[in-house]
């Protein structure tokens, strides 16, 4: 389970935290909790959806304790591999956190709307609207870049 899902969970953690060290800590805690609660896992969703849900809760818990900032650091290289260019990466980084979460899950990790909905514990309609707003904002930013 760890081998198949560590990259996805790490990409998600990096996308929603401001610090690669915090993301690493969140990923470790995610897999510790997953191991602890494995007997309660129901196959109603995929393992990655379940792990992303755990990771999101871990990051929220850590943010309450450590007041994690929303912006991504400049030196995060791992998640850049998922984007076609640094410009697009920077545009995604500027999205509000709720939109960024949906973009990471759907566009990068390949979640369908239902899986993203389960992972983020929000309605499917909210996933769709956040993704639509993110696409609209990214489109505007891309138009601005292309106009230069």
Give the location of each predicted region.
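A short pre-motif secondary-structure segment
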Residues: 102-106
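Arg/Lys-rich amphipathic alpha helix in sigma70-family domain 2
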Residues: 40-43, 52-73, 133
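A short, charge-rich alpha-helical start-of-domain segment used by transcription regulators
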Residues: 1-11, 21-24
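Structural recognition of an alpha-helix C-terminal capping motif at a helix-to-coil junction
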Residues: 25-32, 36, 45-57
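Residues within helix-turn-helix
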Residues: 21, 114, 125
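DNA-recognition helix of helix-turn-helix
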Residues: 60, 120-148
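C-terminal flanking helix
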Residues: 6, 10, 31, 96, ...
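Internal acidic/polar
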Residues: 61, 66-92, 112, 147
């Amino acid at each position: 389970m760890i081998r198949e899902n560590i990259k996805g969970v790490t990409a998600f953690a990096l996308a929603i935290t401001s610090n690669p060290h915090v993301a690493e800590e969140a990923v470790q805690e995610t897999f510790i909790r997953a191991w602890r609660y494995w007997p309660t896992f129901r196959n109603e969703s995929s393992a990655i959806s379940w792990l992303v849900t755990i990771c999101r809760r871990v990051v929220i818990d850590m943010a309450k304790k450590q007041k994690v900032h929303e912006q991504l650091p400049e030196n995060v290289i791992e998640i850049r591999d998922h984007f076609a260019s640094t410009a697009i990466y920077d545009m995604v980084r500027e999205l509000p956190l709720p939109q960024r979460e949906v973009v990471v899950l759907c566009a990068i990790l390949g979640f369908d709307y239902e899986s993203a909905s389960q992972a983020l514990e929000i309605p499917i309609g909210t996933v769709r609207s956040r993704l639509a707003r993110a696409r609209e904002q990214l489109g505007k930013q891309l138009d601005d870049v292309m106009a230069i």
